[in-house]
Swiss-Prot record:
<dbReference type="InterPro" id="IPR024909">
    <property type="entry name" value="Cys-tRNA/MSH_ligase"/>
</dbReference>
<dbReference type="GO" id="GO:0005524">
    <property type="term" value="F:ATP binding"/>
</dbReference>
<keyword id="KW-0648">Protein biosynthesis</keyword>
<keyword id="KW-0963">Cytoplasm</keyword>
<feature type="binding site">
    <location>
        <position position="29"/>
    </location>
    <ligand>
        <name>Zn(2+)</name>
    </ligand>
</feature>
<dbReference type="Pfam" id="PF09190">
    <property type="entry name" value="DALR_2"/>
</dbReference>
<dbReference type="GO" id="GO:0006423">
    <property type="term" value="P:cysteinyl-tRNA aminoacylation"/>
</dbReference>
<feature type="binding site">
    <location>
        <position position="210"/>
    </location>
    <ligand>
        <name>Zn(2+)</name>
    </ligand>
</feature>
<feature type="short sequence motif" description="'KMSKS' region">
    <location>
        <begin position="267"/>
        <end position="271"/>
    </location>
</feature>
<dbReference type="GO" id="GO:0005829">
    <property type="term" value="C:cytosol"/>
</dbReference>
<dbReference type="GO" id="GO:0008270">
    <property type="term" value="F:zinc ion binding"/>
</dbReference>
<comment type="subunit">
    <text>Monomer.</text>
</comment>
<comment type="similarity">
    <text>Belongs to the class-I aminoacyl-tRNA synthetase family.</text>
</comment>
<keyword id="KW-0030">Aminoacyl-tRNA synthetase</keyword>
<dbReference type="InterPro" id="IPR009080">
    <property type="entry name" value="tRNAsynth_Ia_anticodon-bd"/>
</dbReference>
<protein>
    <recommendedName>
        <fullName>Cysteine--tRNA ligase</fullName>
        <ecNumber>6.1.1.16</ecNumber>
    </recommendedName>
</protein>
<keyword id="KW-0547">Nucleotide-binding</keyword>
Length: 466
């Protein structure tokens, strides 16, 4: 079953294979560490994590580089305002970001590349761009001449040929209407940090950082470059201009971009009170796996409306899957094998990977999982399920969780573990056997008070969390 992605560059869904050998050379834009990352950021980072896992599920090896932008306009402004060095300021938020990634179960890329560790490489690249007549200097800064690169606009599919030659933009982020020659190297303002280099004192512009680190670690042509939709212009457009001017080769074969996230139907904003970091939501009692599930549940090219009700629904969905897994592991089924259910498991597995392979259609993949769970729960209730079907069903769930990674609960202070619940159920069974019904009822009530619901069935006791 072919793996296909929508390529922003071609505006088409294309079959994907690496350019050479079996290794995917992938670069993704990481955080700008000027503050705690918010859930809009983590929508993109969760998409990248799913992308990694789907690539691996298709048998590919990964060489994935993610940058850390630890010098840019916002960082410098905030560090200066707080009277901290650049290193002191960014260390706080870099460590916080990595902790949040771990909490959200995001795999660590093969290489994390902080921009400030590559200043010499950036200066060298700027000098080479100057040697090939792609730059000019003005007031101590160095700018890229967008008129020197005929392909400028091919990623965002805009025509910038009529832009005024020599007009400049100094900020890192700007709109298409303000497309101008952009800064590769910025002369420092009074009080700002800077590096003394062969092209003068200053610091790099945002866009040159990613070009240089991507080429250094992955080569002149990447297989995949991914990020948020907001980076298509100017950041990724400028990366292409710089990189292809440096190498004369296609910078990346595939460009993948995750759509925006809304919160309660509105743009996320601190002024609206709907601005959430991962830490905000966890402090409110929402489990990281519920947040991960909600972020992953909508296909990456569709806008996601993130709501607190959606988080509650995500928890219910996850508990349904956990309860199904628990039934498979604990209920005594009749011996034998149902050929019909074996075929149903094979169909579900094919539908699951088929959805993911069609441009990471997570909604279709999840639908196949829940239809399967419904069918097998019905088979268990009717007595059709056989012990010989258990292993394949558990393997299917494991395959699901190797991508979505939500089945293992995050430990909470004071919350009973599965093993503790099973021990209480065993104690209740022993009390009932010895006809101590008062103790059995007491154990049941204590479990209920802790959010555990017991259900007595013909095949034994089932339990689930509220």
């Amino acid at each position: 079953m072919a793996l296909r992605f929508y390529n922003t560059l071609s505006q088409q869904v294309e079959e994907f294979t690496p350019a050479s050998d079996n290794t995917v050379r992938m670069y993704t834009c990481g955080p700008t560490v000027y503050d705690f990352a918010h859930i809009g950021n983590f929508r993109t980072f969760t998409f990248v994590d799913l992308l990694r896992k789907v690539l691996r599920a298709n048998g590919f090896q990964l060489n994935h580089v993610m940058n850390i932008t630890d010098v840019d306009d916002k960082i410098i402004r905030n560090a200066v305002a707080q009277h901290q060095s650049l290193e002191q300021y960014t260390k706080i938020y870099t460590e916080a970001f990595l902790e949040d990634c771990k909490m959200l179960r995001l795999e660590r890329p093969e290489r994390i590349a902080p921009a400030t560790e590559h200043i010499h490489d950036m200066v060298s690249a700027i000098e080479r761009l100057g040697d090939s007549q792609h730059t000019y200097a003005s007031d101590g800064s160095v700018y890229f001449k967008i008129a020197s690169f005929p392909g400028y606009g091919k990623l965002s599919h805009n025509d910038f040929s009529g832009n005024l030659a020599g007009a400049r933009v100094d900020v890192d982020e700007y709109e298409k209407a303000d497309a101008r020659d952009f800064a590769l190297w910025k002369t420092p303002k009074e009080g700002e940090p800077f590096w003394d280099t062969t092209i003068g004192p200053g610091r790099p512009g945002w866009h040159i950082e990613c070009s240089v680190m991507a080429i250094k670690y992955l080569g002149e042509t990447l297989d995949i470059h991914a990020g948020g939709i907001d980076l298509v212009f100017p950041h990724h457009e400028n990366e292409i201009a710089q990189s292809e001017s440096l190498t004369g080769k296609l910078f990346s074969r595939f460009w993948l971009h995750a759509e925006f996230l809304m919160v309660e139907g509105q743009k996320m904003s601190k002024s609206l009170g709907n601005y959430y970091t991962l830490r905000d939501l966890v402090a409110k009692g929402y489990e990281p796996e519920s947040i991960r599930y909600l972020l992953a549940s909508v296909p990456y090219r569709k806008s996601l409306n993130f709501t607190l009700d959606g988080l509650k629904a995500a928890r219910i969905a996850i508990e349904r899957l956990r309860n199904f897994k628990r039934r498979l592991e604990t209920e005594p089924f009749a011996e034998g094998l149902s050929a019909i259910l074996a075929e149903r498991t094979a169909q579900a597995s094919q539908a699951f990977i088929g959805g993911l392979n069609e441009d990471l259609n997570t909604a279709e993949a999840l639908a196949s999982v829940f239809e399967y769970v419904r069918d097998l729960n019905s088979a268990m209730d009717s007595g059709e399920f056989r012990a010989g079907n258990t292993t394949a069903a558990l393997e299917f769930l494991a395959r699901f969780d190797s991508i979505f990674d939500v089945l293992k609960p995050t430990a909470k202070a004071g919350e009973l573990s599965d093993a503790e619940i099973d021990a209480q159920i065993a104690a209740r069974a022993a009390a009932k056997k010895s006809r101590d019904f008062a103790l059995a009822d007491q154990i049941r009530d204590q479990l209920l008070a802790q959010g555990i619901i017991l259900e007595d069935t013909k095949s034994g006791v089932r339990w689930k969390r509220k």
